[in-house]
Amino acid sequence: MAEFHPTAFLLPAAVTMIAGYFLCTALYNVYFHPLAKFPGPRLYAASQIPITIKRLLGDEVATFHKLHAKYGQFVRVAPGELSTINPAASRDVYGHRNPAKSIPKDFKAYYMKNQRRDGTEGLMTADDDLHRRQRKIFSPAFSDRAIREQEPLLKKYTDLLVEKAGVASDADGKVDMVMMFNFATFDFIADCVFGDSLHLLEKMEYNPFLANISAVVKFSAMRRAIRSFPYMDETFEKLIPASMKRKRMEHVKFCDDLVDRRLEKAVTNHPDFWTLVLRANEKGEGLTLGEMHQNSFLFLTAATETTSSLMSALTYLLCQNPDKMKKLVDEIRGRFKSTEEMTTVSLPPLEYLQMCIEEGLRVYPPVPGGLPRRVTADGASLDGRELPPDTVVYYAHYASYHSAAHFARPDEFHPERWASVPPSEFANDCRDAVIPFSAGPRDCIGKNLAYHEARLLLAKFLWTYDVELCEESKDWIKQKSFIVGVKRPLYVKLHRVVREK
C-alpha cells in the first residue's frame, strides 16, 4: 500500500481554495458590489488587474476614452473605481458648487505624500485645513499685481526663447519646440521660485534635474497603479531600484538647496514667490522651512508642465490647421508693430488668441487622465447618484473633452467653438465640461499665470516666425500618458518674417 503524504492533498486543496476565493471575489464585485449598478466591462468590474495593466503601459487615457464612448457618462473601471465625464458630477467631485462637500483627494495616488521624515506636506498633498492656510500665503504670489511685477522676467525668457529657437533652426534646419518650451518655462518658473534661472536657454542643454523629471513622473504614475492593490505599499518600496530612489532624492535635494540659497537673501526687490512668502513670515503667518521645500518641487514641475505641454500642442495643432494658423497670425501681426508692444495688458483682448488657447487645452489637456478622489465614510453623491465609502472617483478630462456627447467634431481643432457667439455648428457644445485647471477650492493656483505666459509665448513666437511642421513630427500628438502626456520631440522649421523698415 502506497504511503500517504499530506502534502499531496494539501497543495491541490490550497490551490483550489485560493482559486475559489478569487472566483467568489470576482463574482461579488461584478454582481453584488455597491458599484455594480454602474455600467462598464465585467472584466474591469471583477478585478483591479485590467486597469492596472493599462496604467502601467501608459494606456489609461485611451482606455477611458473608449469606455466612455461605449458606456456613457459613468463607467466602472475597477471594482472600487468610477470614472465620469459628466460635467455636473465634476462639480460635485471638486466641490465647485459646494466646497464643503468636495470629495477629498486620494492621497495613495500621490508619490509626494509622506516623502519627508518630518511629515511636512505641500499644497498638492496637504489636507483641506493645511491647504487653505498654505494657499492663503501663496495667493499673493499669483495675483494680477504679482504677475505685473513678474512681467519683466516673463518677457526676458520669452525673448530668449524666440532668439534661441531661430538660431537652432538656422543651424540644424529644424528645432525641437518641446525642448525650447521646456527650457523657457523652467527658466522662468525657477527665477520666480528660486530667484535665479536654471540657464537652460543660455546653455541650450538639459540639466540632470530637468532630464529626469519625466522618469520621476512616470515612476509616480506606476507607483499609483501598484498601490491600488491592498498591502502593496511596502512591497512596492522594496521593488524600487536603488538608482531610482537615488534620483528621486537627488530631485528633492536639488530643490531644497535652491530654496536654501534663495532664503539666505531674505526679502529682496526681485519679484519672486519667496519675497511675498517671507513678508508673510515676518507677520508670523508664514510657512515652515519644510513646507517651503515641499512646495518648491511642486511649483517647478506642475507650474511648468501645463504651459510647456500647451505650447507644444498649440504649435502642432496650428501647423496641422493652416487656416487657423493664418487667422491667428493675422490677428497678432495686425495688432502689433513690434513685440515690445505685447504685454499682460495688451494681449488678453486678442479674441482669437484666447480662443486658440482654450481649444488647445480642450484638445490636449495637460493632465488628460483623472486625478483621483476617495469618498469618505459618509459617502458622496455625484449628480444625484450615491457612491459608497472608499470609492475612488475620477473626472476623465480627455474622455470628456473628446466626447461627441459634449462637442461637435470633438477630435478636431476648432477655436471658433469658443467665440462669444459660436457658429451654429458649435452652438450646443458643452463648454462647461472643460476644466483643465480643475475646479473648486483646490483648483490650480497658477492658472492665471499660465494664461499670461501662454499668450506672450505664442504671440511673440508667431509674430517673429512662420512655422512649418517637419514630416517626422506629423503624428506627434499620438502619445502614451503617465499622468501627463509623454511628449516626443516636436520638430519644426522656422522662417523669420521679413518686414519692411
Curated annotation (Swiss-Prot):
Location in or out of the cell: Membrane
Entry-listed glycosylation sites: 212
Biotech relevance: Radicicol is an important pharmacophore as an inhibitor of heat shock protein 90 (Hsp90), an ATP-dependent chaperone involved in the post-translational maturation and stabilization of over one hundred proteins, and which activity has been implicated in diverse pathologies ranging from oncology to neurodegenerative and infectious diseases.
GO molecular function: heme binding; iron ion binding; monooxygenase activity; oxidoreductase activity, acting on paired donors, with incorporation or reduction of molecular oxygen
Chain residues that bind heme: 444
Pathway(s) per entry: Secondary metabolite biosynthesis
Main subcellular localisation: membrane
GO biological process, one term: biosynthetic process
Pfam families: p450
EC class: oxidoreductase
GO CC terms in record: membrane
Keyword Ribosomal protein listed: no
Membrane topology field: Single-pass membrane protein
Protein's job: Cytochrome P450 monooxygenase; part of the gene cluster that mediates the biosynthesis of radicicol, a resorcylic acid lactone (RAL) that irreversibly inhibits the HSP90 molecular chaperone, an important target for cancer chemotherapy. The cluster encodes only two apparent post-PKS enzymes, a cytochrome P450 monooxygenase (radP) and a non-heme halogenase (radH) that introduce the epoxide and the chlorine, respectively. If this cluster includes all the genes required for radicicol biosynthesis, the remaining structural features of radicicol are presumably generated by the PKSs rads1 and rads2.
Protein name: Cytochrome P450 monooxygenase radP
Organism: Floropilus chiversii
